[in-house]
Amino acid sequence: MTHITGTLYIISAPSGAGKTSLVKALMDAQQEPQHGAQAKIRVSVSHTTRAMRPGEVNGVNYNFVDRAEFVRMIEHGDFLEQAEVFGNLYGTSQSHLQQTLDEGHDLILEIDWQGARQVRAQMPQARSIFILPPTQQALRQRLTNRGQDSDEIIEARMREAVSEMSHYNEYEYVVVNDDFAGALEDLKAIFRANRLTQQHQQEQYSELFQELLA
């Protein structure tokens, strides 16, 4: 039986661009009956030292650990990548990521541009997607509408967003989240197209190809 290895997808975006909502909608869509056996996308659960927010579940949204535990994991070489964002540490478990790909699942890794660089250096075969807001004003409005942060923090997030967006040209694909439904279809199209590459089809239909060319 042919073994199919999953594909790693790096998805980055400034805070407020809608990355989390788009990824959730993508995951929800693959549960629809018409997707059938093709539904095999997973989302990587990162480790972080930041405080848990209302509604979040440990092990589902993030693996929440204290800074001492995070540093210990760095020293043990447990992370494929790690970064510090707004004073909080984030990291991706190397062993869990590889296990998921070896099981044939496509895996989404939601990380910033710094983490993306680290991952691409070690896994150049990974696909990369950057999500942009339609305008800076739209981004600011989305951050304000969250009602989670003070004006000072929103300004800091806007500065960070501009810095993050300046790295969009390091990614293979760019999705502009102006219309949510349209952006979701763009995201789905990237995943569908990648499954139709010659290499992926060769893995999935190797016996068929051998028969056709016999």
Swiss-Prot record:
It catalyses: GMP + ATP = GDP + ADP. PROSITE patterns: GUANYLATE_KINASE_1 (PS00856), GUANYLATE_KINASE_2 (PS50052). The keyword Protein biosynthesis does not apply. ATP binds at A13, P14, S15, G16, A17, G18, K19, T20. InterPro entries: GK/Ca_channel_bsu, Guanylate_kin-like_dom, Guanylate_kinase, Guanylate_kinase_CS, P-loop_NTPase. It is an enzyme of class 2 (transferase). GO terms for molecular function: ATP binding; guanylate kinase activity. It holds the Pfam family Guanylate_kin. It is found in: Cytoplasm. Its EC number is 2.7.4.8. One of its GO terms (cellular component) is cytosol. Keywords: ATP-binding, Cytoplasm, Kinase, Nucleotide-binding, Transferase. Its main location: cytoplasm. Residues 6-192 form the Guanylate kinase-like domain. The keyword Metal-binding does not apply. Belongs to the guanylate kinase family. Essential for recycling GMP and indirectly, cGMP. HAMAP family: Guanylate_kinase. This is Guanylate kinase. The gene is gmk.
